[in-house]
Curated annotation (Swiss-Prot):
MF terms in GO: oxidoreductase activity
Pfam families, alphabetized: adh_short_C2
Quaternary assembly: Homotetramer.
UniProt keywords, alphabetically: Bile acid catabolism, Lipid degradation, Lipid metabolism, NADP, Oxidoreductase, Steroid metabolism
Binding site residues for NADP(+): 13-18, 38, 63-64, 90, 158, 162, 191-195
Active-site residue list: 158
Catalytic activity, reaction form: cholate + NADP(+) = 3alpha,12alpha-dihydroxy-7-oxo-5beta-cholanate + NADPH + H(+); chenodeoxycholate + NADP(+) = 7-oxolithocholate + NADPH + H(+)
Residues at the site labelled Lowers pKa of active site Tyr: 162
Protein name: 7alpha-hydroxysteroid dehydrogenase
Function statement: 7alpha-hydroxysteroid dehydrogenase that catalyzes the NADP(+)-dependent oxidation of the 7alpha-hydroxy group of 7alpha-hydroxysteroids, such as the major human bile acids cholate and chenodeoxycholate, to the corresponding 7-oxosteroids. Is thus liley involved in the metabolism of primary bile acids.
Gene3D superfamilies documented for this protein: NAD(P)-binding Rossmann-like Domain
Annotated binding of cholate, by residue: 145, 158
GO BP annotation list: bile acid catabolic process; lipid catabolic process
């Protein structure tokens, strides 16, 4: 028996990258997975492809920028399945061209990022938790970022918003543990998604990797495996409010780490 058999999951922003990898991973373990997306036709093609492998993936319309859509999406899933056992809040956005340091960054962009990155977690969790209470339990996994725990010289809005995701994870965990609901967060480092690879020059990636002890860029499967760990109750039944960095050790080294390794003192 698959560990997630008869479980119903929702993964937001699931057409590619971390969201798609997480949706597939949950489906491979027996879950009925709804993929919250804007591109229904393209996602249906993905679902049809994996249906041949016996996976149950279903597209459902989700636009994180349209607040009215949130309830419609949840109502659709509840109508179809009667419950939601698992929520993976994968949606997240950035505005690097306007989200700079405190003085030079755009103020409207700062609050926009907070509204969508934290607000999407808040709104979806607020809608789904009552159903989880009725179902006597559930698991929420929020996809945050190492940027939420490590300050940057730029992107203040993104960092603060992801820090907010980390905090709301703990708030949900402590407030709803008595109902059998667990909430944890996964904090990716540099992950080889199309969005990341297309926006980062080689020089930056090389510099970033010099601060990663495991000396490789992560892949969406690394994050999906962490999501899977947090979801089934038998694997992580005593874990809630956890903030797990999946970054190859990026937050372990001192600022001198790259220079230290480069000097070949460590071989």
């Amino acid at each position: 028996m698959n560990k997630l058999e008869n479980k119903v999951a929702l993964v937001t922003s699931a057409t590619r990258g971390i969201g798609l990898a997480s949706a597939i991973k949950l489906a491979q373990n027996g879950a009925i997975v709804y993929m919250g997306v804007r591109r229904l036709e393209a996602t249906q093609e993905i679902c049809d492809k994996y249906k041949e492998e016996g996976l149950i993936l279903k597209p459902v319309f989700f636009d994180a920028y349209n607040i009215d859509i949130y309830k419609e999406m949840i109502d659709t899933i509840i109508k179809n399945e009667g419950k939601i056992d698992i929520l993976v809040n994968n949606f997240g956005t950035g505005r690097p061209e306007k989200d700079l340091d405190l003085v030079n960054g755009d103020e409207d962009t700062f609050f926009e990022l907070f509204n969508y990155n934290v607000g999407s977690v808040y709104r979806l969790s607020k809608l789904i938790i009552p159903h989880m209470i009725e179902n006597k339990g559930g698991s929420i996994v929020n996809i945050s970022s190492v940027g939420g725990s490590i300050p940057d010289i730029s992107r203040i809005g993104y960092g603060v918003s992801k820090s907010g995701v980390n905090n709301i994870t703990k708030q949900i965990a402590i407030q709803y543990a008595k109902y059998g609901i667990r909430c944890n967060a996964v904090l990716p480092g540099l992950i080889a998604t199309d969005a990341a690879m297309n926006s980062m020059p080689d020089e930056f990636r090389k510099s970033f990797l010099s601060h990663v002890p495991l000396n490789r860029i992560g892949n969406p499967e690394d994050i999906a495996n962490s999501v899977l760990f947090f979801v089934p109750s038998e694997d992580s039944s005593y874990i809630t409010g956890s903030i797990l960095e999946v970054s190859g050790g990026y937050n372990l080294g001192t600022p001198q780490y790259a220079e230290f390794v480069g000097s070949k003192v460590v071989e």
